[in-house]
């Protein structure tokens, strides 16, 4: 446990502090951590990672008991600084929402110990696709049947970090000087939160029950008809032929009944579609569940990173077939041209916040393999410029070209025209602003929203001048299959009570 003496020194200097303790946890998994600590609570989250469809990331994180929650609705933001005790105690904030968020990020800074990863404290949640309207002048938004906040970020007062390499869990409790508490009182409260979590970790996970293999989900209902989506693709091609854009990414949203516990969907998804960015957020009135393959923007050690993905083939049944499919993908002129467009867009996005002369691709047109598919991937980095920060870096890449198009602003205007509803979470970013000033967000792809016993899945595809409308429609259907399959199998992971 962090000593009071070291805590007090920083506290008296006006610096936010953390209290943390470690526990051997070589028998625990990310799921058991969630089940023990937070699975029956609202305003909780879980983050984990699998690279290449098979290699688990070192750290998995569970967060809970936020001391504050920030939300954005259109041109207004609000905050609940009593979130642990009253979930409804939101107060409006004066000023532009992005400036209130920037101030909150600054308020939440902590100089973290070197033996803790950046993800151990900070602000966690999502910035939806429509947050770009606070930056770019875009036409009026479409109808919003889900009615969710455009962005939600929570600041957990307890974070548990599972280190899969060392087989231990670290429980972290931040303490904020803005609380006005004495050093002794602040330390005592943080230490109590740590000890409560450690006691929960000592107990066995709740008993589970198999609901059977029968799918307990309804039929998918789209906000497009089949012909309506193909007509949208044709309209997009008209804009391309007219020279307005090079590419645009229309999408469709499906809804289906889903009466199983939300965390069961996440557990099913992590099994059927392990991905580099896996997340479960329970915001009380709704949940966001995803397995995204793609970075939106990352800021680490003052280096900004984007990693465009475009170009896909299924995995082969044998190593020989896999190599043949890779060769086919890398010789497909349409796929290569689309990827090059997005690589150039990534350079431009990084260049908006990077020092002149530092933007460069570190990987170009490489193949990255996942459990079911392979993609063409490039990596672009740049050193962040003086005067820029984690929020400006994120906004420079929001939304990614892979969910909007190129040129980006005109493509978004066309998306507003083609799509019948506001996008919401889809196409935005999910991740965190770390307490040490770093940031990591993925694109909200392969992401589901659960609200009022309804599951919403959205997917799109890049339309270029020679796109086939039927093929584009089928691409969106195929991209939704991972979540559809996870929903069908979720009954295998449902528990008797308290799940989600």
UniProtKB/Swiss-Prot annotation:
The residues that hold L-tryptophan are 49, 276-278
Its GO biological process annotations read: L-tryptophan biosynthetic process
Question: Which residues are listed for Mg(2+) binding in this entry?
Answer: 338, 475
Q: Which UniProt keywords apply?
A: Amino-acid biosynthesis, Aromatic amino acid biosynthesis, Lyase, Magnesium, Metal-binding, Tryptophan biosynthesis
- TM spans, by residue? none
Q: Which GO molecular function annotation, any one, does this entry have?
A: metal ion binding
Query: Which cofactors go with this protein?
Result: Mg(2+)
**Enzyme class name:** lyase
Please share the entry's free-text remark on the cofactor: Binds 1 Mg(2+) ion per subunit.
> Could you tell me what reaction this enzyme catalyses?
chorismate + L-glutamine = anthranilate + pyruvate + L-glutamate + H(+)
**Which superkingdom is the protein from?**
Bacteria
Keyword Transferase listed? no
At which positions is chorismate bound?
A: 311-312, 426, 446, 460-462
Q: In which pathway does it act?
A: Amino-acid biosynthesis; L-tryptophan biosynthesis; L-tryptophan from chorismate: step 1/5
UniProt-listed SUPFAM superfamilies: ADC synthase
Q: Known EC number(s)? A: 4.1.3.27
Question: How activity is regulated?
Answer: Feedback inhibited by tryptophan.
Q: Which InterPro entries match?
A: ADC_synthase, Anth_synth_I-like, Anth_synth_I_N, Anth_synth_I_PabB, Chorismate_C
Q: Which family does it belong to?
A: Belongs to the anthranilate synthase component I family.
Q: Which PANTHER family match?
A: AMINOBENZOATE/ANTHRANILATE SYNTHASE (PTHR11236), ISOCHORISMATE SYNTHASE MENF (PTHR11236:SF48)
Q: How does it assemble?
A: Heterotetramer consisting of two non-identical subunits: a beta subunit (TrpG) and a large alpha subunit (TrpE).
Its biological purpose is as follows:
Part of a heterotetrameric complex that catalyzes the two-step biosynthesis of anthranilate, an intermediate in the biosynthesis of L-tryptophan. In the first step, the glutamine-binding beta subunit (TrpG) of anthranilate synthase (AS) provides the glutamine amidotransferase activity which generates ammonia as a substrate that, along with chorismate, is used in the second step, catalyzed by the large alpha subunit of AS (TrpE) to produce anthranilate. In the absence of TrpG, TrpE can synthesize anthranilate directly from chorismate and high concentrations of ammonia.
Q: What is this protein called?
A: Anthranilate synthase component 1
* Organism in which the protein naturally occurs: Cereibacter sphaeroides (strain ATCC 17023 / DSM 158 / JCM 6121 / CCUG 31486 / LMG 2827 / NBRC 12203 / NCIMB 8253 / ATH 2.4.1.)
**Which gene underlies this protein?**
trpE
């Amino acid at each position: 446990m962090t000593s009071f003496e070291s805590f007090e020194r920083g506290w008296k200097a006006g610096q936010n502090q953390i209290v943390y303790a470690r526990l051997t946890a070589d028998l625990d998994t990310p799921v058991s951590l969630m089940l023990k600590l937070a699975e029956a609570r609202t305003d909780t989250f879980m983050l984990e990672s699998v690279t290449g469809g098979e290699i688990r990331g070192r750290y998995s994180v569970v967060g809970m008991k936020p001391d504050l929650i920030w939300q954005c609705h259109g041109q207004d933001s609000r905050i609940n600084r009593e979130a642990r005790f009253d979930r409804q105690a939101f107060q409006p904030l004066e000023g532009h929402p992005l400036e209130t968020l920037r101030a909150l990020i600054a308020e939440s800074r902590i100089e973290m110990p070197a033996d803790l990863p950046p993800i151990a404290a900070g602000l966690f949640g999502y910035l939806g696709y429509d947050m770009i309207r606070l930056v770019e002048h875009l036409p009026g938004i479409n109808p919003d049947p889900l009615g969710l906040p455009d962005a939600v970020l929570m600041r957990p007062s307890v974070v548990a970090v599972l280190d899969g390499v060392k087989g231990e869990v670290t429980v972290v409790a931040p303490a904020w000087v803005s609380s006005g508490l004495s050093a002794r009182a602040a330390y005592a409260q943080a230490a109590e939160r740590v000890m409560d979590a450690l006691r929960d970790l000592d107990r066995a996970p709740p008993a589970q029950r198999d609901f059977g293999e029968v799918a307990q989900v309804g039929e998918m209902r789209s906000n497009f008809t089949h012909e309506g989506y193909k007509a949208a693709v044709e309209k997009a091609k008209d804009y391309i032929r007219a020279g307005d854009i090079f590419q645009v990414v229309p999408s469709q949203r499906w809804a289906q009944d889903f009466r199983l516990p939300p965390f069961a969907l996440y557990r099913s998804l992590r099994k059927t579609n392990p991905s580099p960015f896996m997340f479960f957020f329970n915001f009380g009135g709704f949940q966001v569940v995803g397995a995204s393959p793609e970075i939106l923007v990352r800021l680490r050690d003052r280096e900004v990173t984007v990693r465009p993905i475009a170009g896909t083939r299924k995995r082969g049944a044998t190593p020989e077939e896999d190599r043949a499919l890779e060769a086919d993908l890398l010789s497909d002129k349409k796929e290569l041209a689309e990827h090059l467009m997005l690589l150039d867009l990534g350079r431009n996005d990084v260049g908006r916040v990077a020092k002149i002369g530092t933007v460069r691709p570190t990987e170009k047109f490489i193949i990255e393999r996942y459990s079911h598919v392979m993609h063409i991937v490039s990596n672009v980095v740049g050193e962040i410029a003086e005067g820029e920060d984690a929020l400006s870096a994120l906004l420079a890449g929001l939304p990614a070209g892979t969910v909007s198009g190129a040129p980006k602003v005109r493509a978004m205007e066309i998306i507003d025209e083609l799509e019948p509803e506001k996008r919401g979470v889809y196409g935005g970013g999910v991740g965190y602003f770390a307490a040490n000033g770093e940031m990591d967000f993925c694109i909200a792809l392969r992401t589901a929203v659960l609200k009022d016993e309804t599951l919403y899945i959205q997917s799109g595809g890049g339309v270029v001048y020679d796109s086939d409308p039927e093929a584009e429609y089928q691409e969106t259907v195929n991209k939704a299959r991972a979540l559809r399959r996870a929903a069908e199998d979720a009954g295998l992971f449902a528990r008797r009570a308290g799940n989600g």
